[in-house]
C-alpha cells in the first residue's frame, strides 16, 4: 500500500492495524498517533518518506515513531529528504522539489522490488 499525505497516514495506520499487506509506504504522511493507543506488534515492512521541513513532524513525533517501530519489532525505515516541505512530490505545488521527488520515487520502487519479490 502506498499513500501520499492523508493516504500516507492511512498506509501507516494499515500497518498499525496489522492488515494482511506485504508492505506500506507513507510519503509525507502524518506519523503521529493518539497517545492513548498502545504500541503493538507491526507485522509488515514499513517505508516512511518524510520531508525535512514538514512542520507537522516534530522531533517528538519522530522520537515516538522510532520507539513505536522498535517496540513493535517492525522491519522499518525512514528516509528524510533535505530542503523539502510537505508537498515536495506534487509538481503543482510551490513546494515541489523535483530532485527529492525523483529520489523518493526511486526509494519507493526499490522498497517495492524487495517487498513484492
What are these regions (language model features)?
Residues 70-117:
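C-terminal catalytic histidine-bearing segment of alpha/beta-hydrolase fold enzymes
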Residues 34, 57-58:
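Secondary-structure boundary/capping motif
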Residues 48-50:
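Short beta-strand/loop motif that positions the catalytic acidic residue
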Residues 41-46, 72-75:
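Short, proline-enriched alpha-helix->beta-strand connector loops that line the catalytic pocket
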Residues 58-68:
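Short alpha-helix in the alpha/beta-hydrolase fold that links the catalytic acid
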Residues 53-57, 86:
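Acidic catalytic loop of the alpha/beta-hydrolase fold
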Residues 1-43:
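Primarily recognizes the serine-hydrolase "nucleophile elbow" in alpha/beta-hydrolase
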Amino acid at each position: 500500500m502506498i499513500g501520499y499525505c492523508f493516504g500516507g497516514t492511512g498506509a501507516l495506520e494499515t500497518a498499525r492495524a496489522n492488515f494482511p499487506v506485504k508492505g506500506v509506504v507513507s510519503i509525507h504522511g502524518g506519523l503521529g498517533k493518539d497517545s492513548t493507543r498502545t504500541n503493538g506488534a507491526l507485522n509488515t515492512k514499513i517505508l516512511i518518506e518524510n520531508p525535512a521541513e514538514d512542520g507537522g513532524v516534530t522531533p517528538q513525533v519522530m522520537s515516538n515513531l522510532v520507539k513505536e517501530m522498535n517496540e513493535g519489532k517492525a522491519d522499518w525505515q525512514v528516509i528524510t529528504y533535505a530542503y523539502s516541505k510537505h508537498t515536495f512530490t506534487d509538481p503543482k505545488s510551490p513546494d515541489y522539489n523535483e530532485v527529492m521527488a525523483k529520489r523518493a520515487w526511486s526509494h519507493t520502487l526499490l522498497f517495492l522490488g524487495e517487498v513484492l519479490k
